[in-house]
């Protein structure tokens, strides 16, 4: 039996019924075969439902990693926060006039990455150091890591 299942966007473009069936199948395969699963997805709803630990990537680099509950309760990296705030959460007809939040700008080309933090050009919190140096992934809270100078400094204060 395989020890690892790598599922790359297994629920993309599927309706919620089929999506639930796919996630159930992955879960049962995991349990039946006692294997690990790496689930690659852009769907935060799938992450919230199916993941235990999560790593958020931006422009090919991990910018935050944590267990899923901590990540959704307290996103530390501005990109993660932007992703969470830009998804529809319990929208109803009453708030149909509200616009979803967006992350300004565009993802940089992997051939022309900025010299500092890859998210710095789109980040509302970016400082000079963010544009000059690449932040390392550091433990900000127990078991919760982020690659962000601003989050690291805020945790120290």
PLM regions and their residue ranges:
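Residue-level recognition of short loop/turn positions
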Residues: 1, 58-59, 122, 142
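P-loop NTP-binding/switch modules centered on Walker-like glycine-rich loops
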Residues: 2, 6-10, 14-96
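Charged, flexible cofactor/metal-binding loops and thiol motifs
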Residues: 67-157
């Amino acid at each position: 039996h395989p020890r690892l299942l790598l599922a790359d966007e297994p629920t993309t473009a599927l309706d919620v019924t089929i999506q639930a069936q796919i996630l159930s199948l992955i879960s049962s395969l995991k349990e039946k075969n006692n294997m690990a699963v790496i689930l690659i997805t852009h769907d935060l709803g799938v992450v919230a439902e199916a993941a235990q630990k999560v790593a958020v990537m931006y422009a090919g680099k991990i910018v935050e990693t944590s267990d899923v509950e901590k990540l959704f309760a307290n996103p530390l990296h501005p990109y993660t926060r932007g992703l969470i705030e830009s998804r529809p959460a319990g929208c109803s007809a009453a708030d149909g006039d509200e616009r979803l939040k967006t992350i300004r700008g565009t993802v940089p080309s992997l051939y022309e990455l900025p010299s500092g933090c890859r998210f710095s050009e789109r980040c509302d919190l970016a400082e000079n150091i963010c544009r000059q140096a690449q932040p390392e992934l550091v433990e900000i809270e127990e078991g919760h890591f982020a690659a962000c100078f601003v989050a690291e400094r805020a945790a120290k204060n």
